Amino acid sequence: MQWLITIAIVLAAFGFVVVKLRRFWFEFSRLGSSDLSDQEVSGGPKSSCYGCSGSSASESDLGIRIKPLVQLGDKRKHSVVSMCFLQAAVGGVVYGQEVRPPNYDETIASNYKLGSVLAGPQGQLIESKDQWPAHRKYLLDLFADQEYGYAPQGSVEVRTEVIDDGQGVLGGEVQAGIRRRQLAVFLERNGKQVRIDLLVWSPSDRPKAPCFLGLNFRGNQSTSDDPKVRLTSSWCDSRNPGVVENRATEASRASQSERWPIEEILERGYAVATAHYSDIDPDYDDGFENGVHGLFPEHRSDAEHPNRWGSIAAWAWGLSRLADVLEKLEGIDPKGLMVVGHSRLGKTALWAGANDERFGLVISNNSGCGGAALSQRVYGESVARINTSFPHWFNRNFRKYNDREDQMHFDQHQLIASIAPRPVYIASASNDKWADPLGELLSGHHASSAYRLHGKQGLETQELPAVNTPIGDGAIGYHLRQGDHDLLLYDWEQFMIFAKRNGF
């Protein structure tokens, strides 16, 4: 009897340890979930930003940087132990495997074989643009089923309240020619409600301006120094400037204004709209209970439904609900909507643009793995790495390709192709090896046959251009900016040049 009691105690202790490790991994996954640098995890060489690319060989090999102490939303503090221990003790518990170190050897990365973007499920090639609508649906179903997850089919009521409508304040001065509007967008279903704060800047002298729409990482107040922009009440990562216990404070204002050069955008006649991505779905793994997932509890992802939506699909779905508002908003050209995103939100912009044809131009900035970069190159961030660090971003089916990218019968060039014939712009950064700039370029190149099918020019080259030398005179554009994983004025300048060239 004594030995049975001993075994029971040992098993109970082991179970307790496993539960604690899984909980620790859940909290640990949240460490990368903000846009402190918005790189998924570290790992790429030559970076100067925390969470971007590792600054030492050991950090690069491990694929993440270590922060000794982290303040989390429940006010508990956890010491972060070495990634080696986490991968061995936790990664194996969660997924039954360790994550391989990142590859930066181009001779290894070039060993892959892609299918044609014009090939159907049986390998047959479509030959005319009349066949394109059905083929595009096949591609979107493929990505929904195997990577991003299907959004629910149920409808929501979209209700809008104007919170503020006046002149914008930029650089500390009231701007007479700039109109700033703040709208509370309520998504309502079955007695539940989600609020999204939409901030819209538009030139006062243009009756209908084409509009860039993109989500931000830290709240609308972080995108400018305008003191009248409402402080976000949604979850924020406590490591970001001006955030205390996962809530933004006044000190967070303008903390990412360099990513939103509002004056320069408006000077060129464009409007720009943004919302905090956490308004749509807070960026941590809670089993899909909060945000817009909570509006559809019957559509929650689980082991029995591995192809239901993850957070990227939820953010993309939210962008479409914001498009519902913008296409009816005074001063905005409903035929001039353009979706833009950086990093994980670049992935989001691609998925939103692929599904919603109201976005006439789609822009991906440093979107990397699960975005514009080819997964089968396994260069920089891998499928296993991203699924382990951020299990809530994609659907469960995508995990079966962890360290098995060679078994994928699809890749991101087909996602780019699904946007055709609408123009798409892909931007990379020279130091952002983690996001695989060449893999991003090659997706555009291999998507080009879908554009040629529509009589449009794609991206012909398979070689990276010189830094700060944009390429692509047709419907697919690309540039490699000098520098790190970021979204800067130079990037926006190229986006606007490309937009104008394509009729926006």
What are these language model-derived features?
Residues 40-70:
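Cysteine-cluster motifs in flexible loop/terminal segments that predominantly coordinate metals
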Residues 331-343:
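Alpha/beta-hydrolase fold nucleophile elbow
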Residues 399, 444-504:
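C-terminal catalytic histidine-bearing segment of alpha/beta-hydrolase fold enzymes
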Residues 197-198, 208-217:
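Short beta-strand element of the alpha/beta-hydrolase
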Residues 214-328, 371, 375-377:
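Cap/lid segment of the alpha/beta-hydrolase catalytic domain
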Residues 94-152:
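N-terminal pre-domain segments of enzymes
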Residues 292-295, 364-415, 440-461:
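Mobile cap/lid helix-loop segments that gate and shape the active-site cleft of serine hydrolases
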Residues 420-437, 481-483:
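Conserved strand-to-loop "acid loop" that flanks and positions the catalytic carboxylate
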